[in-house]
């Protein structure tokens, strides 16, 4: 039997669709890992390669985030019109299974590791069900190593992606992670992770941990980082800003090869942080916190959500000044996006403030709700100005002109974001 896994592309002309550096979908490699060996599994990434709708694959499997969902449905229609069976999973489908079922033959709701073998067995016997939802999560100790061989020959910047934990103990209003995983924070055994890392470094010393919060449990993270010390790895992941308060853990991360962290500052307004549910973020300490990262050789890709009720047009120059004064190596400025399943969507729906459910525009670059502190035009123009200004050469010089070991990552990252923003503006 043959299976074709497809990662749908982002809408063209959007920032995330224009970035030249791309990472593979680890979730598809994880699904491949729980696929029985009698299946021949291949991958197609719609972002940069054509889809063969006349493939001889027996089963087509898609995953999608919300802005990719319309493209995923288009792809599904192309295959179903040729008599192929199409199944789909991912964050968007898990929150809107009925919508997906009008476009595909079956959906996987939630984590697919447990139910995937059963779905395949049902397909082979002609008894495919419409919805597959696990009764319990797979033990993290039982999750097999992702089948990264499906990435071979693809145009990816890095295929050394790995997941050590699932979930997040926090419950931020705008975040999809809790809606998908719940508030459980589950961890793979440290020994398993270290063994997998030993294999990964044979291909490349750079590793990206896709964990949503790799330091949520210091009793887990500390021995992990200590075990990684001396491996010669250079790695990136996600951590909250209050990671800076744990100097021992941060020092261990730096010594183990951490070059950078995606850090959700989210807002400079403490009232907005409280509304978001960012219970550990303290805006008054952000500057010192950023310095603590730098002191340990760890660069920051900061994230600041634009459009919360406390934001006014003054937020844009204020954010630029902060980012430059804090010398953040890189940053993104996503527009508040009320994704299906999130608490912020439920709140904005109750307030009658959702103005669009065109999923293509749920890309963190378009406004889909009525803001309070400014007009839609002011928010959109402020977003565009902030991105252009932050990734201008003068700003890049002010932020990263001093040599720092993380420049090997953040130098190219800044140039990549700058080029993508310019391509987006020119309509390339």
Language model features by range: what are they?
Residues 1-202:
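Acidic, low-complexity intrinsically disordered segments
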Residues 2-8, 40-43, 103, 123, ...:
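Radical SAM enzyme core and accessory elements
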Residues 8-14, 96-99, 219, 271-276, ...:
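Flexible glycine/acidic-rich beta-alpha junction loops that bind and position SAM and/or redox cofactors
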Residues 34, 38, 78, 82, ...:
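Alpha-helical structural signal in soluble globular domains
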Residues 87-88, 108, 131-132, 236-238, ...:
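Structural detector of well-ordered beta-strand residues that form the stable sheet scaffold
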Residues 99-118, 201, 252-262, 318-333:
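Structural recognition of alpha->loop->beta junctions
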Residues 144-301, 308, 312-317, 321:
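Radical SAM [4Fe-4S] cluster-binding motif and immediate context
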